[in-house]
Amino acid sequence: MKNYDELSSMEIDTLREIGSIGTGNAATALSQMLGREVNITLPQVRIMGYNEAIDWIGGPEAITAGVLVKMSGEISGIMLSVQPLEFANLVLESILGLSAKDYSELESMETSALVEVGNIMISTFINALAGLSGLTVDLTVPAFTIDMQGAILAFGSQSDYIMTIGGDFICDNKQVPCRLLLSPDIRSLNFLLRKLGVDSGE
């Protein structure tokens, strides 16, 4: 059974393809929800160590919002949508006609909008993964938190390695960061690769 750091180049390329398709679907879902055209730059999909992933999303002490969903069924693990303030304001301006200078200004109506958007993006991504692999994946009710990024990632961490999916959403000639993190447990990672037909069985 392979760990993340033992994946072959073909296996990593397959995960990248899933990440690209899933992120494209998430951008389409976001566009429909906001009622605005939203495109995404070519996403960068990487397998990162835990500490590298924290630095990638902005460092351990930066405050951010996160929507986390746990996966069960034929795949177990977590998926996390990190919502930098620029992304949060894109959502809030589109849905509620307001923006926030920092996360402390958010009230229940604003956080509910962010949770709904994060949940739809994650669900759309996972549905794409399930469709490509033929697997059944169940998702929990999303959890929402505002905290230091290191704490958010520690809460959801399933292993020492994480699949990171990053790009920029483009809306009204503005670019806002898209940061998604997928962490199936090791058993699920290997099962997924077998279902996709690329597990070398080493």
Q: PLM features: residue spans?
A:
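Composition-driven recognition of glycine/serine/threonine/acidic- and proline-rich low-complexity segments
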Residues: 2-27, 31-202
